[in-house]
């Protein structure tokens, strides 16, 4: 397991593959749990040897507040500065609603691999 991973039901794991870095979020991502996410995003978005593509897997995320969203917005900026791409995959209804309410849905590359057309039911 990656040393950046937080312990307990709220976890952040970073796995580096040949073509991308994958950050998986589990549980809640709020002010109390955002530190490991920031560290993983910093590494994936700025490390000289990291792949050019960063994927954040949200399929196990139960809740996200403004602290988690802020970390992802900062990561988007870091990726742009370092010529990397950032994709958020499989966001659930709560997170997708947070993106829509804040207008951040237009800022991120969103992927829904579990649907036939790549879009969530909420976006139709």
Predicted features and spans:
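STAS-like cytosolic regulatory interaction modules
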Residues: 1-62, 74-124
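ABC-family nucleotide-binding domains
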Residues: 65
């Amino acid at each position: 397991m990656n040393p950046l991973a937080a312990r307990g039901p709220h976890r952040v794991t970073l796995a580096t593959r040949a073509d991308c870095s994958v950050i998986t979020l589990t549980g809640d991502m709020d002010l109390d749990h955002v530190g490991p996410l920031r560290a993983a995003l910093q590494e994936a978005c700025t490390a000289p040897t990291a792949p050019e593509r960063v994927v954040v897997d949200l399929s196990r995320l139960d809740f996200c507040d403004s602290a988690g969203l802020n970390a992802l917005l900062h990561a988007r900026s870091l990726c742009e500065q370092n010529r990397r791409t950032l994709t958020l995959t499989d966001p659930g209804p709560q997170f997708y609603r947070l993106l829509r309410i804040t207008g951040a849905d237009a800022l991120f590359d969103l992927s829904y691999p579990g649907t036939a057309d790549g879009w969530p039911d909420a976006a139709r």
